Swiss-Prot record:
Keyword Transit peptide tagged: yes
Family that this chain belongs to: Belongs to the complex I NDUFA12 subunit family.
Subcellular location: Mitochondrion
Biological processes per GO annotation: cilium assembly; mitochondrial respiratory chain complex I assembly
Species for this entry: Bos taurus (Bovine)
A GO cellular component entry from the record: respiratory chain complex I
Lineage: superkingdom: Eukaryota
Keyword Cytoplasm: no
UniProt xrefs under PANTHER family: ADH DEHYDROGENASE [UBIQUINONE] 1 ALPHA SUBCOMPLEX ASSEMBLY FACTOR 2, NADH DEHYDROGENASE [UBIQUINONE] 1 ALPHA SUBCOMPLEX ASSEMBLY FACTOR 2
Biological role: Acts as a molecular chaperone for mitochondrial complex I assembly. Complex I functions in the transfer of electrons from NADH to the respiratory chain. The immediate electron acceptor for the enzyme is believed to be ubiquinone. Is involved in the initial steps of cilia formation, including removal of CP110 from the mother centrioles, docking of membrane vesicles to the mother centrioles, and establishment of the transition zone.
Gene for this chain: NDUFAF2
Compositional bias of kind Basic and acidic residues: 108-118
Pfam families attached to this UniProt entry: NDUFA12
Known partners and oligomeric status: Interacts with ARMC9.
Protein name per its UniProtKB record: NADH dehydrogenase [ubiquinone] 1 alpha subcomplex assembly factor 2
């Protein structure tokens, strides 16, 4: 069955007007192809394609960065012309310089942060009581007079008076 599929593929490619033109390679060994717009044997217009043939054939082995950013932009049609090797090397050098500068900045910022933390007093331990939305965190004690009005109304509590002349 494998030989029949290969034969069918050869016949299909022979009848097709698809012309695969290699436009470049990268340092990883990936090959990039351009197929211009053409009409197939049925008269349908097939739009242009940009294809990468990866050096490692399986998709599972793909990792981010295996295809340079410039080639990826060309494949996604965000740039019209394929990148040159000199352009890729120049951009790679710029990326490395930016990474070194950001690392230096991060280290300087870390030192400044440590120095400013030495000048500050240590944080005071705070005691958390209740919930943040609660209006009062202390112990509720009943009062003789009513408190507040509306939804938060609390009636006053009754307290008996001891010396009022009660008969016993």
């Amino acid at each position: 069955m494998g030989w029949s599929q290969r034969l069918f593929g050869v016949i299909r490619r022979a009848l097709s007007k698809e012309v695969k033109e290699q436009v470049g390679t990268d340092r990883f060994g990936n090959k990039y192809y351009y197929i211009p717009e053409y009409k197939n044997w049925r008269g349908q217009t097939i739009r242009e394609k940009r294809i990468v043939e990866a050096a490692n054939k399986s998709e599972i082995d793909y990792e981010v960065g295996d295809i340079p950013t410039e080639w990826e932009a060309w494949i996604r049609k965000t740039r019209q012309t394929p990148p040159t090797m000199e352009e890729i090397m120049k951009n790679e050098k710029c990326r490395e310089e930016i990474q070194m500068k950001s690392q230096d900045f991060y280290e300087k910022e870390k030192l400044l942060q440590e120095e400013s933390n030495k000048e500050l007093p240590p944080p005071v331990q705070t005691q958390i009581k209740g919930h943040a939305s609660a209006p009062y965190f202390g112990k509720d004690e009943p009062s003789e007079s009513p408190t507040s009005t509306g939804k938060t109304f609390q009636p006053g509590s009754w307290m008996p008076h001891g010396d009022k002349g009660h008969s016993q």
